[in-house]
Structure formats: C-alpha cells, structure tokens
Amino acid sequence: MRFRFCGDLDCPDWVLAEISTLAKISSVKLRLLCGQVLKDLLGGGIDYEKILKLTMDARFESGDVKATVAVLSFILSSAAKHSVDGESLSSELQQLGLPKEHAASLCRCYEEKQSSLQARLRACSLRVNRLVGVGWRVDYTLSSSLLRTVEEPLVHLRLEVAASPGAPAQPVAMSLSADKFQVLLADLKQAQTLMSNVG
C-alpha cells in the first residue's frame, strides 16, 4: 500500500514496527512528545529529560525511547516534505494501526507547525555547508633574478566555510593557475544560473 506521507511509496518496515510503540503511550503524552520532536526539527534542540519523563509510564527501554523519537521525526518531516495535510496524515496513520485519538493528537501538532517546518526543511535542503567568507589574491611574478622564465599568474582563494548555522568557520585554501581559475569561474556562473532558474 502506498502512503502520501512516504512520498507515495510503501511505508518503511521500521516505521510500521514502531507504530505499536507509539500506541503504548497516551494521546496527551504523544502530543507533548511531538512538540519536543518538532522543536528539534525546527532547530531548537530536544530535551531528552522531558522525553524520558513522558515515556516513563509506558516503561520504555532506552531503545524504545530513541525509536519513538526517530519515528515521530520521520513521520513529521516526511509529511511536511510531501505537503500532506493533517486530515490525510491522520487517515494514513490510522491505516497503519495508530489509534484514532493518537493520530488526531499527532496531526494537531503537525498542522500547527507545518508551514514553519516546511520553511525550515526548505532552508536546509541540498545544503552541505554555508560559505561565510571569501578572500583572494593574485600572485604575478613579472621577473626574477632567480627565474629565467616568467611564471603564469597564480590565484590564491581562501574560503571560510561553516559546517552548520552557528558553527565556527573553517578556512579552506587553494591555489589555481589562471586557466583553472577561468574554468572554475565559468562553472560557478553556470551553476548559479541553473540554481536561479530552479528557485
């Protein structure tokens, strides 16, 4: 069976297995868990102590707690990626065996944060790291008493790259011949044109 929140594909087996784990906690606690997972997906971090307190009644082992967070994260982010409305998501989760109250509780949380979650996912999509700064210098030796030939110019690039937003920037240095720099510049301009046509 195909599900919209899975991108019109079959639901992964591990998600099916964890639906029964979600059913072990109350719908109210599931809503609070969803709030914590959404906070994490939106970049606010996750409070594991609060999650452990919420799952204490169900006597979850640490593996069950992690699996619960993972399955909620998958369901919420995947539904947002595929622009699934709350009603459809609720229906699909019930088809997978999640009780109606639980599905309604999860979907209320999802609907409240759907647009901000989609914006966050869009901002993080296809982004390996962030360019913080660029520096460059051209060395061109006109003549030298030690060299018989005049060397071609060298372009020294220094890129400052942050692995994630808020992380300290790491310098990446490289030296290129003038020809290689021209090829790099042409490729970057072509990539910029293609990306501007996409978004």
Swiss-Prot record:
Its main location: cytoplasm. Disulfide bonds: none annotated. Keywords: Cytoplasm, Nucleus, Transcription, Transcription regulation, Ubl conjugation pathway. Residues 130-199 form the COMM domain. It is found in: Cytoplasm; Nucleus. GO terms for cellular component: cytoplasm; nucleus. GO terms for biological process: signal transduction. It comes from the Eukaryota. It holds the Pfam family COMM_HN. Scaffold protein in the commander complex that is essential for endosomal recycling of transmembrane cargos; the commander complex is composed of the CCC subcomplex and the retriever subcomplex. May modulate activity of cullin-RING E3 ubiquitin ligase (CRL) complexes. Down-regulates activation of NF-kappa-B. Component of the commander complex consisting of the CCC subcomplex and the retriever subcomplex. Component of the CCC (COMMD/CCDC22/CCDC93) subcomplex consisting of COMMD1, COMMD2, COMMD3, COMMD4, COMMD5, COMMD6, COMMD7, COMMD8, COMMD9, COMMD10, CCDC22 and CCDC93; within the complex forms a heterodimer with COMMD8. Interacts with RELA, RELB, NFKB1/p105. Interacts with CCDC22, CCDC93, SCNN1B, CUL2, CUL3, CUL4A, CUL5, CUL7. Belongs to the COMM domain-containing protein 4 family. This is COMM domain-containing protein 4. It comes from Bos taurus (Bovine). The gene is COMMD4.
